[in-house]
From Swiss-Prot:
Any one Gene Ontology molecular-function term assigned to this protein's record: proton transmembrane transporter activity
Function text: Subunit 8, of the mitochondrial membrane ATP synthase complex (F(1)F(0) ATP synthase or Complex V) that produces ATP from ADP in the presence of a proton gradient across the membrane which is generated by electron transport complexes of the respiratory chain. ATP synthase complex consist of a soluble F(1) head domain - the catalytic core - and a membrane F(1) domain - the membrane proton channel. These two domains are linked by a central stalk rotating inside the F(1) region and a stationary peripheral stalk.
Main location group: mitochondrion
Keyword entries, A-Z: ATP synthesis, CF(0), Hydrogen ion transport, Ion transport, Membrane, Mitochondrion, Transmembrane, Transmembrane helix, Transport
Biological source species: Loxigilla noctis (Lesser Antillean bullfinch)
Keyword set includes Flavoprotein: no
Entry's Gene Ontology BP terms: proton motive force-driven ATP synthesis
Protein name: ATP synthase F(0) complex subunit 8
Amino acid sequence: MPQLNPHPWFFIMLASWLTFSLIIQPKLLTFVTMNPPSNKPPIAPSTTPWTWPWT
């Protein structure tokens, strides 16, 4: 059964993952901007309760 022969398929999988990991991924990571860490403490939002007209 040819689909059980790993010779051509393993090389294709390995080549595609190496292409992705070494070429495409570093190019994509340059476009992703991370938020810089801030020293401000997290502030909880102040909310007011809603009064429902039927209660």
